[in-house]
């Protein structure tokens, strides 16, 4: 389990969550995640919801919909957004710090 890993949501087609929690907190039983949806299904909020490319599609990472869930439910990552970590971190700064 690694920060920025992408996991398919159980029972949902083309719906994913991204693990945003720092790797050094692996001992916790919960992980902080945010949903990622096809870009045509949500509105981009400048800076707050980064656009990312994943599996040949454009997605929006909905950082303002953070949630914590059991780490055991995150099985077998289907990819990673580590290449987009700068945009994701900027979005989280906007969410928590306002800039």
Model-found features: residue ranges?
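C-terminal terminal-subdomain/extension
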Residues: 54-99
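Compact nucleic-acid interaction/catalytic patches
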Residues: 3-6, 10-50
């Amino acid at each position: 389990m690694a920060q920025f890993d992408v996991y398919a949501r159980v029972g949902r087609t083309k719906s994913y969550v991204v693990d945003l929690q720092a790797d050094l907190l692996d001992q916790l039983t919960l992980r902080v995640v945010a949903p990622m949806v096809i870009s045509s299904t949500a509105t981009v909020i400048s800076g707050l919801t980064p656009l990312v490319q994943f599996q040949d599609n454009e997605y929006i990472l909905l950082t303002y919909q953070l949630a914590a869930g059991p780490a055991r439910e995150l099985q077998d990552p289907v990819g990673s957004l580590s290449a987009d970590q700068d945009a994701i971190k900027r979005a989280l700064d906007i969410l928590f710090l306002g800039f």
